[in-house]
From Swiss-Prot:
Family annotation (Pfam families): SurE (PF01975)
InterPro entries assigned to the protein according to its UniProt record, in alphabetical order: SurE, SurE-like_Pase/nucleotidase, SurE-like_sf
Main subcellular location of this protein, as a coarse class: cytoplasm
Residue sites binding a divalent metal cation per the record: D13, D14, S44, N102
Family named by the database record: Belongs to the SurE nucleotidase family.
Catalytic activity, as annotated: a ribonucleoside 5'-phosphate + H2O = a ribonucleoside + phosphate
Taxon lineage: Bacteria, Pseudomonadati, Bacteroidota, Flavobacteriia, Flavobacteriales
GO molecular function: 5'-nucleotidase activity; metal ion binding; nucleotide binding
Record localization: Cytoplasm
Cofactor: a divalent metal cation
Details of cofactor binding: Binds 1 divalent metal cation per subunit.
Protein name: 5'-nucleotidase SurE
Amino acid sequence: MNKKKPLILVTNDDGITAPGIRTLVEVMKELGDVIVVAPDSPQSGMGHAITISDTLFCEQVTIKESYKHKEYSCSGTPADCVKIATQEILHRKPDLCVSGINHGSNSSINVIYSGTMSAAVEAGIEGIPAIGFSLLDYSLNADFEPTRKFIKTITKNVLKNGLPIGVVLNVNIPKLKEAEIKGIKVCRQANAHWEEEFDKRTNPQGREYYWLTGKFVNKDEGKDTDEKALEEGYVSVVPVQFDLTAHHFIKDLSSWSLND
């Protein structure tokens, strides 16, 4: 008896027509049955936002005539896409959800703001093994071909071994040729941050407005971080948990005089 192929849900935050998701779809088609539910427009930096005070549209679309799998374009956020896919579109629970390939880094603190990773986290919340993939190239002409080998390797391992409940993977791939990438490293998230700046301007009507700018600052010198791995030419893999409890502080917090 033929073993049923794994069902793989593909989404992203750059939009359903973005080059990154097209590469991801092609790789996933080699590993299972694919269905795509992705935003109809770019949703970068949306984090785990969901649509609760507006209508949500989701319709089947044809991106390529040669595709035999189904694709759906959704007016909502990446997290919305996963929710509506699992609750309204799919007839069975996916074996895996993959999100990406993002244009740009989602390493370190960027994971908090990332729509790419929030889609993966939403899948994890729903008990679906999930991976977020990002390429450290913000160019509209980014070359995603070097990512294929590493995405396939990591995905095959997740399909084979599964992931613990409450854990998803954050994968970042350096902007290098495939032959220049040294391998894959399991890492921790670097303790870095953004130093934000606001560019204050005035529009023709005299109304002030702001553009958010800033720079990424990493003072974490640890050799086991995602930032260090990427700097050295490795693909970084960070196991991410969405239980935000600071377990190490519970005992100390319990000693406070909170009921006095």
